[in-house]
């Protein structure tokens, strides 16, 4: 759970923090990059409406967790390989990342046998997970500055999402 939440937050922080710069590097205008960035934030809210409708019907949530994690992986890679489709990749990433966050927090409650255990699991998963996530944007920014483009940071996010799956 800790790794699942941490990787999701790391990838989300990298994309939310660097998406406008990524889009500008691919020829988008500042207005276009800002609009796509806004779509990302809206797309992360949609799973809050959709995921609960599906979750209560599933006995095993691993399949949906893997699917939404792979949405993050494919969309991060897509931003590099097919930047002309950035709106689609952003919407897919937003949905996947939002759903992953909901699932990660839900897993804590599902795995705990008591309120005390849920609080302990939540504290550990979120504190370690967010500590990991906080390293993402500066690290990927440094990699970008060293490499000169966003290929390695985006592919690193895609690979991290595969690990999360």
Whereabouts are the PLM-identified features?
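Multi-pass alpha-helical transporter architecture, strongest
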Residues: 155-165
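Helix-loop junctions at membrane interfaces in 12-TM secondary transporters
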Residues: 80-90
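Extracytoplasmic gate region of multi-pass secondary transporters
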Residues: 1-48
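Small-residue-rich segments within alpha-helical transmembrane domains of MFS-like 12-TM solute carriers
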Residues: 9, 13, 94-102
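Structural signature of the two symmetry-related core transmembrane helices
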Residues: 63-77
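Intracellular juxtamembrane helix-capping segments at the cytosolic ends
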Residues: 99-113
């Amino acid at each position: 759970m800790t790794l699942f939440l941490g990787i999701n937050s790391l990838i989300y922080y990298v994309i939310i923090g660097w998406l406008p710069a990524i889009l500008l590097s691919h020829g988008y205008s500042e207005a276009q990059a800002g609009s796509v960035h806004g779509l990302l934030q809206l797309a992360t809210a949609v799973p809050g409406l959709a995921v609960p409708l599906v979750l209560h019907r599933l006995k095993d949530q691993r399949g949906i967790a893997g699917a939404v994690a792979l949405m993050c992986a494919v969309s991060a890679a897509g931003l590099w390989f097919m930047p002309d489709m950035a709106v689609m990749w952003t919407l897919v990433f937003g949905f996947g990342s939002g759903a992953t966050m909901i699932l990660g927090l839900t897993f804590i409650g599902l795995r705990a046998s008591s309120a005390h255990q849920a609080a302990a699991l939540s504290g550990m998963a979120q504190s370690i997970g967010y500590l990991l996530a906080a390293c993402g944007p500066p690290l990927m920014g440094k990699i970008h500055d060293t490499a000169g483009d966003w290929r390695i940071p985006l592919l690193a996010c895609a690979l991290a999402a595969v690990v999360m799956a």
